[in-house]
């Protein structure tokens, strides 16, 4: 009879539906080398997750529904890809395996070209995206479509100068009127209200190269009102690189916006070894109180569309006009002359590599 209370207790614990003791955490990653992103040296420890949030870091006691043994591995915050062209690829496959498996958890989109706006003349010219009907006209509309489709990565985007410019100007090389600049400013304002980080430009080739410094300043003043920033693929990465960096600095100065220079480099071999001078330009601007920075990529190659090697004048009127010019023997002769000899103010990939075609690789594969 003395054993009855114990027996009753065991039976009670075995009755289906009895409440179980809840784990302290959903997940604990144990024994990894923790690099916390603050600049501190790495340390061995655990990371506990509860309700999709980091709940504890260090030597974590307690239980978890799932545990991962990270011995010999690095545990770090998700990486941010600050220059991504996955805007439309994420709509095709939101799993983003190529990024997730590298530890990338956030992608920054919209460099020069963005997923919106598609207004006015640009909307009429670009009814399809990667062969599918485009379902939106604004950057906010794109965000809504992406939300519905779902994605494994966090996403943020700039509004691209090319979209803004072509929405108003189409394929024209004409100078915009004051009224058209005002229309562009309204599109930038709309995108900023939709959640854009700021304005991003690609002013090395049309249509972005059609914008003057004053044009970009006018649009960046709208960005400044929303606390955004200006990110730029500068106008020239060759022998005009110093002037191009100064232009980016001046835009930040006049518009009152932080500036980020994208993949800063000196591509023309005649100027190799002079990067310290550009660093001095940037440091001088920072000493002045301007908020300016630059980023680089860790390899000695660049990538661009093949059309970037064709002189700017040949792009006027859009792709169909360009194809017509390419079919014209006299126009091709003029293009060849300009490619081989250069045009003042135009960054020329061919002359930048020492007029050596063997240093240029042409690929038909989709690269991003």
Protein language model regions, located:
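Bacterial N-terminal signal peptides
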Residues: 5-17
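Sec/Tat signal peptide C-region and signal peptidase I cleavage site
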Residues: 18-22
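Histidine-rich, glycine-flanked metal-binding segment
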Residues: 23-27, 34-78, 93
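Divalent metal-coordination and catalytic microenvironments
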Residues: 32, 47, 52, 72, ...
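Metal-associated gating/positioning segment near the N- to mid-region
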Residues: 62, 67-137
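Histidine-centered catalytic micro-motifs
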Residues: 79-89, 201, 230-236
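Active-site neighborhoods of metal-dependent hydrolases
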Residues: 143-152, 158-178, 184-205, 210, ...
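Alpha-helix-loop-beta-strand connector modules within alpha/beta enzyme cores
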Residues: 213-232, 255
């Amino acid at each position: 009879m003395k054993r009855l209370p114990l027996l009753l207790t065991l039976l009670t614990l075995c009755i289906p539906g009895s409440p179980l003791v809840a784990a302290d955490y959903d997940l604990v990653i144990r024994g990894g080398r923790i690099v916390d992103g603050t600049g501190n040296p790495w340390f061995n420890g655990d990371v506990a997750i509860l309700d999709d949030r980091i709940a504890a870091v260090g030597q974590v006691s307690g239980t978890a529904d799932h545990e991962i043994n990270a011995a010999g591995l690095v545990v770090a915050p998700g990486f941010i890809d600050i220059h991504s062209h996955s805007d439309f690829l994420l709509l095709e496959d939101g799993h983003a395996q190529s990024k997730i498996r590298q530890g990338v958890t956030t992608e920054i989109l919209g460099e020069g070209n963005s997923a919106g706006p598609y207004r006015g003349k640009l909307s009429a010219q670009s009814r399809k995206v990667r062969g599918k009907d485009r379902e939106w006209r604004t950057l906010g509309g794109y965000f809504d479509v992406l939300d519905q489709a779902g994605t494994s990565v966090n996403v943020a985007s700039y509004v691209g100068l090319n979209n803004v410019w072509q929405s108003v100007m189409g394929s024209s090389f004409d100078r915009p009127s004051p009224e058209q600049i005002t229309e562009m400013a309204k599109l930038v304002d709309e995108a900023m209200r939709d959640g854009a980080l700021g304005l991003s430009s690609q002013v090395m080739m049309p249509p972005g190269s059609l914008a003057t410094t004053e044009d970009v300043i006018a649009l960046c003043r709208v960005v400044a009102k929303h606390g955004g920033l200006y990110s730029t693929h500068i106008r020239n990465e060759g022998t005009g690189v110093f002037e191009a960096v100064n232009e980016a600095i001046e835009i930040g100065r006049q518009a009152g916006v932080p500036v980020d220079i994208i993949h800063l480099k000196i591509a023309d071999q005649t100027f190799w070894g002079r990067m310290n001078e550009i660093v001095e330009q940037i440091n001088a601007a920072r000493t002045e109180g301007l908020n300016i920075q630059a980023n680089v990529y860790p390899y000695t190659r660049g990538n661009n569309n093949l059309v970037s090697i064709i002189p700017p004048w040949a792009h006027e009127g859009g792709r169909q006009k360009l194809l017509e010019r390419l079919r014209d023997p006299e126009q091709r002769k003029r293009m060849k002359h300009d490619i081989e000899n250069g045009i003042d103010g135009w960054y020329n990939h061919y002359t930048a590599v020492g007029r050596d075609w063997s240093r240029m690789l042409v690929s038909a594969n989709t690269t991003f």
